[in-house]
Amino acid sequence: MKFIGKLLLYILIALLVAIAGLYFLLQTRWGAEHISAWVSENSDYHLAFGAMDHRFSAPSHIVLENVTFGRDGQPATLVAKSVDIALSSRQLTEPRHVDTILLENGTLNLTDQTAPLPFKADRLQLRDMAFNSPNSEWKLSAQRVNGGVVPWSPKAGKVLGTKAQIQFSAGSLSLNDVPATNVLIEGSIDNDRVTLTNLGADIARGTLTGNAQRNADGSWQVENLRMADIRLQSEKSLTDFFAPLRSVPSLQIGRLEVIDARLQGPDWAVTDLDLSLRNMTFSKDDWQTQEGKLSMNASEFIYGSLHLFDPIINTEFSPQGVALRQFTSRWEGGMVRTSGNWLRDGKTLILDDAAIAGLEYTLPKNWQQLWMETTPGWLNSLQLKRFSASRNLIIDIDPDFPWQLTALDGYGANLTLVTDHKWGVWSGSANLNAAAATFNRVDVRRPSLALTANSSTVNISELSAFTEKGILEATASVSQTPQRQTHISLNGRGVPVNILQQWGWPELPLTGDGNIQLTASGDIQANVPLKPTVSGQLHAVNAAKQQVTQTMNAGIVSSGEVTSTEPVR
């Protein structure tokens, strides 16, 4: 019996020595190489680490150094200087579920197709790590990341798991090519729902704070978002800049505050922007709300050729439409002011009062083409209940027929300027007058115009102007049909008899001042020459009592003989 006892003792000592030897051997480079090779050969993963460390002061912790881990045939998912694995009694029933995993000084490379990792942890901690996810939905890259996930149960394509609490900070981060620094993220994951209870970052030389939630269908609910002192330059057009907002199923905003922002793109810019938006939901190219509000002001706004100074907008949104409480801006050296309502039903914009004063505006070269284009889908009708203009300078630099109105004043009532997405003067009345004008190099003084319009005709009851010594007076009518049949009757007294030469009528065989009478008609159609449609008659008498009558048919004038109005003696 003593022999058997000694034998068992020797065997136990040998086992303890072997275990101790194996324990120390596994912590050598040889042990690390053999463990790495065994895992790589007997699983679908490749593993390599430089050394394994275990200390009796922390008996439940195993530390792997210089670790590389990933799926076979794919780039490494994890590269870390140190991986600290804390074990627990759970390993008896779930060997791959550990208590804590601490990753230090390394990089996690993630994609939407990342295969499920073969282990879990009650807590995943990151210390001075980096994230790279270039081909995922969010195109994420982050450096100096610290934080954790509780619990951590990774799934295929969901490296953080399907249900967990998250807390991260990052020294720098880039999300969809938008860089940020000093980032803080706190929240939770519940299957495909991501809740960010606390979000903060330094972005574009400013700050961003808020909280939001991303739902399973990809829609976002932003309860509160505040951006201050943003200074952002973008290479994208304004449409492309906001394209990501249209790519989500819907975006619900509880409160958005923008303070002192400066944004700039290739053909747009806004400086010193203050914006407050509340209770709005955007879906594709539409919006919904019960009680939405937008208040916005800026020092300067540029979009293409539109350049506004000190614009102020205050609006209220409802299911029925938009109440424009205030819009004011300095524009082209003057001031623009209006208020009104946009009605969703009928897509009608009704401006209660519109005032333009002090403008010095040159019309775009293609303004006639723009006038003939249809309006956007949201603007089926535009109505002005009241309109006023004061001391405006309007210039058209068309080389074929340049003109200018100086000190233009006017007023109008119940004007309909858009119907069925077409520009025009479809109803209402207007009166315009100016201190001076030039029409194709012909100077006149105090031109004035009075018109009324209905669904069938635009009637110009007064059209007059003073020349150097005389006066021109006319009446006209323009039909509302696509042909735009136009009739005009013009009388001139004490005017140059060839004053109409600059306006399209051939030179008369008369000289000097006199009286003229013109009746003409034609069709002012889009993309159709005017001259071939014009027919009319011109009668002129000069101060020498010479007279001539000419007739125009299809734009061609038949020459008339010059006769005398004096009786034959």
UniProtKB/Swiss-Prot annotation:
Residues 1-6 are cytoplasmic. Residues 28-569 are periplasmic. Its main location: membrane. Disruption phenotype: The mutant does not exhibit growth defects and does not show outer membrane permeability defects. The keyword Chloroplast does not apply. The chain crosses the membrane at residues 7-27. Belongs to the AsmA family. This is AsmA family protein YicH. It comes from Escherichia coli (strain K12).
